[in-house]
UniProtKB/Swiss-Prot annotation:
SUPFAM superfamilies, per database record: Glutathione synthetase ATP-binding domain-like, Succinyl-CoA synthetase domains
Source organism: Pseudoalteromonas translucida (strain TAC 125)
Top EC class, one word: ligase
Name of this protein: Succinate--CoA ligase [ADP-forming] subunit beta
Example of a GO biological process term: tricarboxylic acid cycle
Gene: sucC
InterPro entries named among the record's database cross-references: ATP-grasp (IPR011761), ATP-grasp_succ-CoA_synth-type (IPR013650), ATP_grasp_subdomain_1 (IPR013815), Succ-CoA_synthase_bsu_CS (IPR017866), SUCC_ACL_C (IPR005811), Succ_CoA_ligase-like_bsu (IPR005809), Succinyl-CoA_synth-like (IPR016102)
């Protein structure tokens, strides 16, 4: 789950990190009132969406009058912002962040992720702020400095100082950096972050460090113990099919292919997508129905898959470990009858009662294509999707 910039900065402020005075607004009038409340003669107005590249897409602007603030909000609220990180439809803009203007002398980068290789939280800092860190990692990796956080003792001030020296900070800035580093380290574990970025972390004209932007990703598996973070959830920023699937405990991710995939188990689902791709097909989705694949969940999964107009065939790949294949077969038959599937359906069953399951499908009288193996299933579904 991702947070909006204004939500990230709200958390930053609670942990004593330096952020701009700002207000998230729902209407042009509210945005104008926020600018007046902040004061001054210059403001930054930002569209709030779960995507980067807002500035290049016109979603961030420096304005000098209240009328400009109001016009920016009126122009964007209720519309979609399309950036290089969104699809062609873009993301809906429901809030505008109005902030005080910050004079920038230099831009740095500070971020943290859960590193699977070291199995620790790793902080990254760079003098190359304000640009995509992936670009820096690819072109000049020596400019990215890292600090691994020991989970037993947490972030340490000496680690912050080591990074600060590499960033060329002066003694005053070093103190500020240590405070920011320690606050972010505590915040990362307190709220079960998966990703954290301040890009840019700026040095102002007065020589102070300031968190100019904020990007936070939360570990979705930890939301059950994060009631405060759950309140930040914005379903408008998610694919409607993915949100609908989650309500039925289905793990669904929309893709851009034409072969719908319904599988039990995330690993098997990824393997299924790989073999479809290997045989010349393009998966339209990732969909894991989980271990308890009941008729109701299979039926809902079919509905979600078929809501994508690009789907020309569906591959159902079930391994009967926890559940019996004959029971799954009955669920598939019931779902096909209920939903009224009008594209070819290829089913591969393996595991407990697999032979019985295939027999149930064969005797159903429905136009369901049975597959003997995963390779056979992939070949048949790709051919079916191509109309062969």
């Amino acid at each position: 789950m991702n947070l909006h910039e204004y939500q990230a900065k709200q958390l930053f402020a609670e942990y004593g990190l330096p952020v701009s005075t700002g207000y998230a607004c729902d209407t042009p009038e509210e945005a104008a009132a926020a600018a007046e409340k902040i004061g001054g003669d210059m403001w930054v107005v930002k569209t709030q969406v779960h995507a980067g590249g807002r500035g290049k897409a016109g979603g961030v602007k420096l304005v000098k009058t209240i009328d400009e603030v109001k016009a920016f909000a009126a122009n964007w609220l209720g519309k979609n912002l399309v950036t290089y990180q969104t699809d062609e439809k873009g993301q809906p803009v429901a809030k505008i962040l109005v902030e005080s203007c910050t004079d920038i002398a230099n831009e740095l980068y500070l971020g943290a992720v859960v590193d699977r290789a070291s199995r620790k939280v790793v902080f990254m800092a760079s003098t190359e702020g304000g640009v995509e860190i992936e670009t820096v990692a690819e072109e000049t990796p020596e400019l990215i400095h890292k600090a691994e956080i020991d989970p037993l003792v947490g972030p340490q001030a000496y680690q912050a100082r080591e990074l600060g020296f590499k960033l060329g900070l002066n003694p005053v800035q070093m103190k500020q950096f240590v405070k920011i580093f320690m606050g972010l380290g505590k915040m990362f574990t307190d709220f079960d972050f998966a990703l954290l970025e301040i890009n840019p972390l700026v040095i102002t004209d007065e020589g102070n460090l300031h968190c100019l932007d904020g990007k936070i990703g939360i570990d979705g598996n930890a939301l059950y113990r994060q009631p405060k973070i759950r309140e930040f959830h914005d379903p408008s920023q998610e694919d409607s099919r993915e949100a609908h699937a989650a309500s039925f405990e289905l793990n669904y991710v929309a893709l851009d292919g034409n072969v719908g995939c319904m599988v039990n188990g995330a690993g098997l689902a990824m393997g299924t997508m790989d073999i479809v791709n290997l045989h010349g097909g393009k998966p339209a989705n990732f969909l894991d129905v989980g271990g308890g694949a009941t008729k109701e969940r299979v039926s809902e999964a079919f509905k979600i898959i078929l809501s994508d107009d690009n789907v020309k065939a569906v591959l159902v790949n079930i391994f009967g470990g926890i559940v019996r294949c004959d029971m799954i077969a009955e669920g598939i038959i019931g779902a096909v009858k209920e939903v009224g599937v009008n594209v070819p359906v290829v089913v591969r069953l393996e595991g407990t009662n697999a032979e019985l399951g295939r027999e149930v499908l064969k005797n159903s009288g429905l136009d369901i294509i049975a597959a003997e193996s995963l390779t056979d299933a992939a070949e048949k579904v790709v051919a079916a999707a191509e109309g062969k």
